[in-house]
Amino acid sequence: MEHIYQYSWIIPFVTLPVPMLIGAGLLLFPAATKKLRRMWAFPSVFLLSIVMIFSIDLSIQQINSSFIYQYIWSWTINNDFSLEFGHLIDPLTSILSVLITTVGILVLFYSDNYMSHDQGYLRFFAYMSFFTTSMLGLVTSSNLIQIYIFWELVGVCSYLLIGFWFTRPIASNACQKAFVTNRVGDFGLLLGILGLYWITGSFEFRDLFKIFNNLIYNNQVNFLFVTLCAVLLFSGAIAKSAQFPLHVWLPDAMEGPTPISALIHAATMVAAGIFLVARLFPLFVIIPFIMNLIALIGIITVFLGATLALAQKDIKRSLAYSTMSQLGYMMLALGMGSYRAALFHLITHAYSKALLFLGSGSIIHSMEAILGYSPDKSQNMVLMGGLTKHIPITKTAFLLGTLSLCGIPPFACFWSKDEILNDSWLYSPIFAIIACFTAGLTAFYMFRVYLLTFDGHFNAHFQSYSGKKNSSFYSISLWGKEGSKMLNKNLRLLALLTMNNKERASFFWKNTYQIDGNVRNMTWPFITIQNFNTKRIFSYPHESDNTMLFPMLILVLFTLFIGAIGIPFNQFNQEGMLLDIDILSKLLTPSLNLLHQNPENSVDWYEFVTNATFSASIAFFGIFIASFLYKPVYSSLQNLNFFNSFAKKGPKRILWDKIINVIYNWSSNRGYIDAFYAISFIGGIRKLAELIHFFDKQIIDGTPNGVGVTSFFVGEGIKNVGSGRISFYLLFYLFYALIFLLIYYSVYKFII
């Protein structure tokens, strides 16, 4: 077993040859490299598969032996200072390594087909391979310096991949926004690392924790300064994991290709902040203030992300805000001290959200066959609907991922989210109420996405809904599905289904848009997609190829069964012996013994069923509300009396509409947080820059320039005096002598 750990340092560097070879090939043999570009997917997947096998083997060794291995190379600079580099293999490392490699392989396999038409195919695989190298280096780092180096490399890869289509201004702005926002957190992280080194004199985790605990126990350090360093360290995690208030970059990061959203912004990179807090958990756990701060930031992010997802029309941005909210659950769990629950939810959410992002990529891929390449259209749920019969496999996979994220048993996220909700009641009833309410919101907005995408009719073909000859309006619903059936004008339900063009959009029923007659009668062009020199012509969305469906089906299996590794109860065998089937707790045993007073994680059946019933009921209630509001209206017209009674509530209805509009505006405007940052920070910095520019030009440059100009004019004036006549020289001599005497007399009188 020792030799396995000894050679584990190679894990981050196995995939590094791929970007190097692609770069060398494009530099030396550009034509041949581009001609054989599809072959580069194989070495990317193959090398990452080797790392995956190695990581799984290490995880099995961790489960069987609970052994922590650390190997260090020391570089001595002088007698007082040396840099140490190495790798650390512990349960946290093995979990993240398996997660990165499994999701990474599936995403690369998926990307081979998804990006096959793109001119940047080679660049994409080079970036992705370099990202996996950076991420694996991050999780295997044995000290803070290595973590910071790979932390920055991960940020660079994210910048490159978000701005992959850099010719699009919106993508270019998005990658800059992500880069700058993360630099704020990274600067705090760097200051925290330096402050921690100043306190302990070490960057190595094991030495650092021991020294830090001794200093705190013996009261030999300024606790306020220690708390400040901890807050600075946590700021790096806030930015990287898109926690409030540095969350603003994540929705814009969806401008990159969809596969990177599945790998980077769902499963791995955004989880780096969770990993950092988990890695430094022995340090944070002895500082009550920082633990409370982590929990507070987590619960704010949980609720904020859920509310901002309510009104999104872009399917990827809806999933992005969902990711933000779920990362808040993980941060909340860490702040409460539920180390195991946080990592459990990290695992289950990664696979479920990767499935949802790949499913959204399949949806977008099918929509592009109709609408062409235009993210504003192909990602817009307004133009979707009725996709069940066109992409049934994608629909099934997306539904399973949605049910998992909603917290429906027995899917993966149910087990982890239920554990966090249960622990939140022990920590704070207020936090627990917010967390449970947000769990219902999660089920609501996720099923909203599902219904808007797959339910009802396909909305992209307006001519398919020409309706009756007297109908001149076609209504596209942003919040629900509206039928095309003609209703009696006397029905009061009509007020709920149609609105005047001049009216603003409400929460559930959106504006109707008048369609020009020429547009209604025009023939929509078919989109020809070339792939492997074959042509396919589509007039409706089509199912993706097998190379895109296969990774989704594998992720479906993970979504169904990965929750089994953390089932929090034990069973007895036929001989009456207690069987420990909680693999996750067994894997985390070394950490749990250090961080928890009571490592016993088993619960009885009654408690488990009671808690599970409560959390599942919340999820089902959210799904019911979403189904009630977003199912097609034409299927609900059988009970007009119910709808009419709902519509007759005059003042209450008006108040309800106002509340709904406030929520809609809050959600669609991103909680006004981006606008606040634009006005306060961006506008303030620009005003400050203008002031500095004015000071530089007018004061700094103006002073020497003014002296020079003044000297020039004085010299020109004196030049005219020098005419060569002695009488003028004597006159000026007497004049200057008189001025000197006056000054001397004034000073003398002042002194006397």
From Swiss-Prot:
The chain crosses the membrane at residues 9-29, 40-60, 89-109, 125-145, 147-167, 185-205, 219-239, 258-278, 280-300, 327-347, 354-374, 396-416, 425-445, 549-569, 608-628, 728-748. Belongs to the complex I subunit 5 family. It catalyses: a plastoquinone + NADH + (n+1) H(+)(in) = a plastoquinol + NAD(+) + n H(+)(out); a plastoquinone + NADPH + (n+1) H(+)(in) = a plastoquinol + NADP(+) + n H(+)(out). Its EC number is 7.1.1.-. It is found in: Plastid, Chloroplast thylakoid membrane. GO terms for cellular component: chloroplast thylakoid membrane. Its main location: plastid. It is a multi-pass membrane protein. Keywords: Chloroplast, Membrane, NAD, NADP, Plastid, Plastoquinone, Quinone, Thylakoid, Translocase, Transmembrane, Transmembrane helix, Transport. NDH is composed of at least 16 different subunits, 5 of which are encoded in the nucleus. PANTHER family: NADH-UBIQUINONE OXIDOREDUCTASE CHAIN 5 (PTHR42829:SF2). InterPro entries: NADH_UbQ_OxRdtase_chlpt_su5_C, NADHpl_OxRdtase_5_subgr, ND/Mrp_TM, NU5C-like, Proton_antipo_N. One of its GO terms (biological process) is ATP synthesis coupled electron transport. It comes from the Eukaryota. Gene3D superfamilies: 1.20.5.2700. One of its GO terms (molecular function) is quinone binding. NDH shuttles electrons from NAD(P)H:plastoquinone, via FMN and iron-sulfur (Fe-S) centers, to quinones in the photosynthetic chain and possibly in a chloroplast respiratory chain. The immediate electron acceptor for the enzyme in this species is believed to be plastoquinone. Couples the redox reaction to proton translocation, and thus conserves the redox energy in a proton gradient. This is NAD(P)H-quinone oxidoreductase subunit 5, chloroplastic. The keyword Transport applies.
